[in-house]
Amino acid sequence: MASLPVLQKESVFQSGAHAYRIPALLYLPGQQSLLAFAEQRASKKDEHAELIVLRRGDYDAPTHQVQWQAQEVVAQARLDGHRSMNPCPLYDAQTGTLFLFFIAIPGQVTEQQQLQTRANVTRLCQVTSTDHGRTWSSPRDLTDAAIGPAYREWSTFAVGPGHCLQLHDRARSLVVPAYAYRKLHPIQRPIPSAFCFLSHDHGRTWARGHFVAQDTLECQVAEVETGEQRVVTLNARSHLRARVQAQSTNDGLDFQESQLVKKLVEPPPQGCQGSVISFPSPRSGPGSPAQWLLYTHPTHSWQRADLGAYLNPRPPAPEAWSEPVLLAKGSCAYSDLQSMGTGPDGSPLFGCLYEANDYEEIVFLMFTLKQAFPAEYLPQ
């Protein structure tokens, strides 16, 4: 299977004096710009994460190219004595506030150490910007207020990674996907379950939603309309050789109908993070969904390789996912997607930031729906 033609493919973060992992991408439509985030690490190891870095990309519509500016450190996104991980950006379109959520972990304490000792030392943090990421606030530790007593019931937790979601409910609620390793048994290994952090007051206060099925880890959420109902669909990494999908009809508080989507394969033994977004359907008419879903993930069933895109034109139906189209051949891992409006061929435009070349670089891809799924795209 050959890789599809794309509008742009460019390396945004490259290993050298530092390694870069865990991409997160945010499109700001009013600015026609992208913010690409990643962890800067001393090496590829998780415990060698240090800071969160950012590159700004300006989309030039006449040339259909993104011009990337120099790399900068989000210096405020850290707690003293901690390393910053899992960048999760979110733009509140109603207030103009840009949030960057992340987790902070002391020194080089690993996830495995927290699972073995059953001692949770991870903190949930945010910084905010009111000038589209040019300057940032001091860090705010949300852990105690957002999690409360349940913190002691977890061995560790994380957010995202990747973009978060603002809903189209009356409150324009903010949703931050997450997962926690819960100590459900006094002796057995803690079990991971996905959930969401929720704010109904533009980030002033935060609540914790209920857990999805067990054995769900890194996840992302998207909002779709099904008839008269808005649904938040959650797509999670699992150890079960396939993705887990679940739906919420109360804005991410509760998730029902957790399903294993066998078409969305997970490479053994631990699976891999993936990205999901909704975007306006190119089809109109009675019975046509208002949004479709796009999902990116390694397509190889045995290893982290061959980045693919999957389309769901009847969301959130798990059986409606397409076969994948190949975005990039070879080694790949984590990715993050953004919808960027309309492309030069009149079909929806997407940006994808993904890990490539055995974690040696993080690459930006830009492509249209018509390039990826020509048979599916019908002009209005």
UniProtKB/Swiss-Prot annotation:
Q: Where primarily located? A: cytoplasm
* pH dependence comment: Optimum pH is 5.6.
Alphabetical UniProt keywords = Carbohydrate metabolism, Cytoplasm, Glycosidase, Hydrolase, Lipid degradation, Lipid metabolism, Repeat
Q: In which tissues is it expressed?
A: Expressed in skeletal muscle, fetal liver and embryonic carcinoma cell line NT2-D1.
- SUPFAM superfamilies for the chain: Sialidases
Q: Name one GO biological process term.
A: oligosaccharide catabolic process
Provide the reaction this enzyme catalyses: Hydrolysis of alpha-(2->3)-, alpha-(2->6)-, alpha-(2->8)- glycosidic linkages of terminal sialic acid residues in oligosaccharides, glycoproteins, glycolipids, colominic acid and synthetic substrates; a ganglioside GD1a + H2O = a ganglioside GM1 + N-acetylneuraminate; a ganglioside GM1 + H2O = a ganglioside GA1 + N-acetylneuraminate; a ganglioside GT1b + H2O = a ganglioside GD1b + N-acetylneuraminate
Q: Enumerate the residues binding substrate.
A: R21, R41, Y179, Y181, E218, R237, R304
Residue window of motif FRIP motif: 20-23
Q: What is its EC number?
A: 3.2.1.18
Q: Which Pfam families match?
A: BNR_2
Please name the catalytic residues of this protein. D46, Y334, E355
Name the enzyme's class: hydrolase
GO cellular component labels: catalytic complex; cytoplasm; cytosol; lysosome; membrane
- Source domain of life: Eukaryota
Q: Which InterPro entries match?
A: Sialidase, Sialidase_fam, Sialidase_sf
User: Where does the UniProt annotation place the signal sequence?
Assistant: none
- Mark the BNR repeats by their residue spans: 127-138, 197-208
Which compartments does it reside in?
A: Cytoplasm, Cytosol
Which purpose does this protein serve, as stated in its record? Exo-alpha-sialidase that catalyzes the hydrolytic cleavage of the terminal sialic acid (N-acetylneuraminic acid, Neu5Ac) of a glycan moiety in the catabolism of glycolipids, glycoproteins and oligosacharides. Recognizes sialyl linkage positions of the glycan moiety as well as the supramolecular organization of the sialoglycoconjugate. Displays preference for alpha-(2->3)-sialylated GD1a and GT1B gangliosides over alpha-(2->8)-sialylated GD1b, in both monomeric forms and micelles. Hydrolyzes monomeric GM1 ganglioside, but has no activity toward the miscellar form.
Concerning its family, UniProt says:
Belongs to the glycosyl hydrolase 33 family.
Q: What is this protein called?
A: Sialidase-2
